[in-house]
Design a protein with these regions (language model features):
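Periplasm-facing N-terminal accessory domains of Gram-negative outer-membrane beta-barrel systems
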Residues: 35-125, 129-131, 463
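Periplasmic N-terminal accessory/gating domains of Gram-negative outer-membrane beta-barrel systems
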Residues: 97, 109-112, 125-231, 242, ...
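Short loop/turn motifs that connect adjacent beta-strands in outer-membrane beta-barrel proteins
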Residues: 177, 234-235, 250-255, 275-279, ...
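Transmembrane beta-barrel wall of Gram-negative outer-membrane proteins
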Residues: 262-287, 300-336, 344-366, 372, ...
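Surface-exposed extracellular loop regions of Gram-negative outer-membrane beta-barrel proteins
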Residues: 376-377, 423-434, 476-497, 508, ...
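Outer membrane beta-barrel strand-and-loop segments of large Gram-negative receptors
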Residues: 396-400, 441, 445, 449-451, ...
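Gram-negative outer-membrane beta-barrel transporters
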Residues: 591-594, 613-702, 807
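C-terminal beta-signal and adjacent terminal beta-strands/loops
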Residues: 683, 692-708, 727-729, 735-810
Length: 810
């Protein structure tokens, strides 16, 4: 079988595969504990004294020697080279009281913990970034965006429901599928090319209400990182981006709570010590009550409808001495839509993970994680003649081990293994006893993916730094299953010439590939840097769908004989400049992305119930390029950002659009975003967002023809030559807070207006007959037809939409 450069099918018995993996595990365990000791270092962690949350980006240095300073990482951890003892170690962080501690030589044998007390801040000291002020200048990361949770909460919200994905859509390089959706399209990649993970476990459907809200409750989150490029070697599996979401650690000192009562939903989060101060918990729940409003309707049919969602999440952490931490994370989310007892659609996610973090020594760290993620949906049609129940389920389980070794103050390496097992259960359509529909059961799909990875961070000089990585993946499609064969290995409808059955765990197809990652940063001065990066990613799962927004019933496909893994290669170059003592940040990033083996549907494709989905899709190439500009203000009474993105996205697939290149639906060349937040005083603040983007690419009919006295639209062979009108919208919010000092119960009222000036942004166009020049005329109910003509009806979701939310803390 011919394949593209970069990966190839190979014949390797599973026993040999497992021998390779076993050798790698043994080797890395030995390597992790056999490195010799380097120059002694002091290690520790920095926490908020009130909430016990780790402080990211705190400054740590020896008194009188700031040049030796370091900053804390994502878990509040740090390592600093020892000096002559005794010596004073200084910990500082904006908005907190400084801590100074005398360190003795023996303190290097154990980890140190610092708890900083918050201090009263003036408005000029308010910051919007949970990071050090010059981070964008000095770090190696390109294409990474971190949005603090407090910033997300300050953005005006649809229905008053603060939303993570809707906030990420405001960042440069991130597109949306249209009004009222949370689907993300990052640098020309489709929605299924984003790896969304919660505490390291993947989430396969990250939206509620058909994409209007994301599944994450911001009250329970500690951080959100979006990687648009230059993904670390320890991550992989998707072609375009990583959205890394982390739950908070619970407060280890006292019970704390927060929540909100909104227009269509309410939420509550509790956290505190579990069994003393060496353990903690956080649990969070959210539920909508949209279905309760339906019961107030005068329409009996509406009163019988149901529309709701809920989600529950939690994290339980146990600190086992000075060196070990064990944490358990859980998430469950569910949606249900019921129409007058005739139709029911439910879908849910179940995600859980366990993480063990160990400090082996001052320079050696180990993380071990196991996880399980499941997504399923059920469709129930209650009809005497055509009733049925349709179910589908997919799951991913995995284990990941990661070793980190600090070789010196200039070099750090990490390496590890990541094994994943995919189970895509069959589509099962079970007809009711009296139904005239036949039973449909498709074959299950299973895949095993084993990855080895290695990364190096190297500082060549104070100006030049490098991050290099290599990831190798071996993918095996395994039985139980059935594989169809076709003439010339080209799947065609009704063209199969045979089948082959495989037993459980019997290998069916192999793919393997190397994924190099490389990034450089050159520091021109303390306020100006240049960065460049290259990365390759492989993706072994894809969605076959005719909806760009993403639906709960989308068909997921595993790589097999006919559907090859996506290969993504991206290069990027960026300029980063800070001004006015790091109050202002300016960045300009350009990128080019090459995609191979992306899929699209044939004309008239039906992918939901077929067992031969490979006959409904075609694969080919894609590419995307663009320039992202971001100007951000970090401190002061007014904070926020202004961004502009120019980008183009293309596909070229044999058998689609007359084999010519075309734009996918989510190609939107121009994107302008403005986000502002202003603090008038400790009680009052206001937020404003403005969004302008090019319209979605679509295919409009070029004419019509008559069938049974009805006009049927005639579509061209060339795809997406037309566009929706440009999209623009302004949102605004005002927040009042109870700022009285010393109160245990703190409340705030948020008043938001979505689509402030009532722009009717198109959601869809319907091409159909218009009777009697009335788009609402129904021939079966409204009388005789006097005239008819082919017409188009535009649907929009929202005009001006006000909301109110009460938020509280205790």
């Amino acid at each position: 079988m011919s394949v593209r450069q970069g990966y190839s099918p190979i014949q390797m018995p599973l026993l040999s595969v497992f021998r390779v993996i076993t050798f790698w595990i043994s080797f890395t365990f030995c390597l992790g504990f056999s490195f010799g000791q380097n120059a002694p270092k002091i290690r520790g962690e920095v926490f908020d004294a009130v909430s016990s949350q780790p402080l990211i980006g705190a400054n740590v240095y020896w008194e009188g020697n700031t040049a030796s300073g370091v900053v804390t990482g994502l878990d509040g951890d740090f390592e600093i080279i020892s000096v002559t003892f005794p010596a004073k170690l200084v910990i500082s962080y904006i908005g907190y009281e400084r801590s100074v501690r005398v360190i003795q030589a023996k303190d290097g044998e154990k980890g140190l913990r610092f708890f900083l007390k918050p201090e009263e801040m003036s408005l000029e000291e308010i910051i919007i970034q949970e990071r050090r002020p010059d981070e964008q200048i000095k770090n190696l990361e390109m294409g990474k965006a971190s949005v603090p949770i407090e910033t997300i909460k300050n953005i005006p919200a649809l229905f008053g429901e603060v939303d993570l994905f809707r906030s990420l859509q405001l960042l440069p390089g991130v597109q949306t599928a249209g009004e009222g959706t949370t689907g993300l399209f990052v640098r020309g990649g489709s929605a299924d090319q984003n790896l969304v993970q919660l505490d390291g476990a993947p989430v396969y459907n990250a939206s509620h209400f058909f994409g209007i809200f994301s599944v994450f409750n911001p009250d329970a989150l500690s951080k959100v990182d979006l990687y648009k490029g230059n993904m670390p070697a320890s991550f992989g599996g998707r072609a375009s981006s990583l959205i890394d979401v982390s739950l908070q650690e619970g407060n280890r000192n006292q019970i704390h709570g927060q929540g909100g009562i909104g227009t269509i939903s309410s939420r509550l989060t509790l956290d505190g010590p579990l069994f003393g101060k060496n353990s903690s918990f956080i649990v969070s729940g959210r539920r909508t009550y949209a279905d309760l409003f339906l019961k107030l309707s005068r329409d009996e049919n509406l009163r019988n409808n149901k529309l709701n969602f809920y989600d529950l999440s939690g994290r339980f952490s146990f600190f086992l001495g000075e060196r070990d931490k064990l944490s358990f994370s859980i998430y469950e989310g569910s949606d249900f839509l019921g129409l007058d007892d005739q139709f029911g659609l439910g879908w849910n996610n179940w995600v859980n993970s366990v993480n063990w973090n160990r400090v082996n020594s001052e320079t050696s760290f180990f993380d071990l994680q196991a996880y399980y993620s499941r997504y399923q949906y059920i469709v129930d049609i209650n009809d005497p003649e055509n009733g049925f129940e349709w179910t589908n389920r997919l799951s991913e389980s995995g284990i990941k081990a990661n070793w980190i070794r600090v070789l010196s103050d200039k070099s750090t390496i990490n390496w590890g293994i990541h094994s994943q097992f995919y189970q895509f259960s069959p589509v099962d359509l079970a007809p009711d006893p009296e139904s005239g529909i036949g039973e449909i059961v498709t074959n299950p799909k299973n895949g095993l993916l084993n990855n080895l990875f290695f990364g190096l961070n190297q500082n060549f000089s104070p100006r030049l730094s490098m991050e290099a990585g290599l990831r190798w993946g071996l993918y095996t499609q395994v039985g139980e299953g059935v594989e169809y064969s076709y003439p010339d290995d080209r799947p065609e409808r009704d063209g199969e010439i045979g089948t082959e059955s495989f037993d459980a765990w019997e290998p069916m197809q192999f793919y393997q590939g190397l994924e190099p990652r490389l990034a450089f940063r050159y520091l021109i001065d303390e306020q100006f840097s240049v960065k460049a990066a290259y990365n390759r990613n492989f993706q072994y799962v894809q969605i076959a769908t005719n909806s760009s927004a993403g639906l709960p019933i989308d068909r997921w496909m595993l790589a097999d004989r006919y559907t090859r893994p996506i290969q993504s290669d991206q290069i990027s170059l960026g300029l980063f400049r800070n001004f006015d003592n790091n109050r202002w940040e300016l960045s300009v990033e350009g990128y080019y992305k090459d995609l191979r083996n992306v899929i699209d549907l044939r004309n008239g494709a039906q992918v939901l119930f077929t067992d031969q989905v490979e006959t409904e899709v075609l694969s080919g190439d894609g590419w995307a390029y663009g320039v992202e500009t971001l100007l951000r203000k970090n401190t002061g009474k007014t904070t926020g950002w202004l961004s502009y993105t120019w980008s183009r996205t293309w596909r070229q697939i044999e058998g689609v659009s007359l084999n010519q290149k075309y734009n996918p639906r989510f190609d939107r060349p121009h994107d302008v975003t403005l986000v502002l937040n202003h603090e008038f005083n400790p009680r009052w603040s206001a937020g404003l967002t403005f969004v302008y983007t090019s319209g979605l690419a679509v295919t409009f009919p070029v004419g019509s023809y008559v069938v049974d006295n009805q006009n049927v639209p005639l579509y061209p062979e060339l795809r997406n030559l037309d566009r929706f009108p440009d999209y623009h919208r302004m949102d605004a919010s005002i927040t009042w807070r109870n700022a009285d000092k010393g109160r245990k119960w703190k409340g705030s009222w948020n008043f938001s207006v979505y689509n402030l000036y009532g722009r009717k942004n198109p959601f869809a166009y319907e091409f159909r007959d218009i009777y009697n020049n009335d788009i609402n005329f129904n021939p079966s109910e409204d009388g005789d037809i006097i005239s008819s003509r082919p017409g188009v009806v535009m649907t929009y979701l929202f005009t001006v939409l006000p909301s109110i939310t009460y938020n509280f803390q205790f």
